[in-house]
C-alpha cells in the first residue's frame, strides 16, 4: 500500500511543479484535490480497503446517490466554462465553483461508499485542497475581471447551493 501511495505522490508532485512555477497555486490545489479523489477511489478498489471501519449498507447507498448531483455539477461546469469569460448563467448563477463542489461531493461520497480509513484521509485532504483552490481562484478572478467579479461574489455563494434554492 505504501509503495502505491509513494508512486502517487511522485506523480502528483511531477504534475504540480509546472503549475507552481506559473504562480497559479490554486491550479495546483485543484489538481491535487482532484488527484487525491481519483487516488482514493483507485487505491480503495485496488487494495480492497472497503469496510475496514464499518460496512453500513445505507451509507454506501447514500454515497452512490451522491455521485449523481456531483456528476451534474461537474458536467454543468464544464459546459459553462468553455466560454472562457466570466459566466453568470446556468449553474454559475447558483454556485461560483460547481466543478470543485462536485468533486468535493464525490470525494465525500467515496467515504460513504468505501467506509475505510484510506478513503477518509485522502478524501478529507482532497476536499480541503478543493476548498483552498476555490478561494484562491476567487482572488485570481478578482484580478482578471475586477469589479464585475466582486459583484458576482457578492451575489453567488462559493459552494452553498442551498442559498439560491430558497
Model-assigned labels for residue ranges:
Residues 93-105:
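Membrane-interface loop-to-helix entry segments
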Residues 1-88, 105-166:
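Membrane-anchoring alpha-helices and their flanking helix-loop junctions
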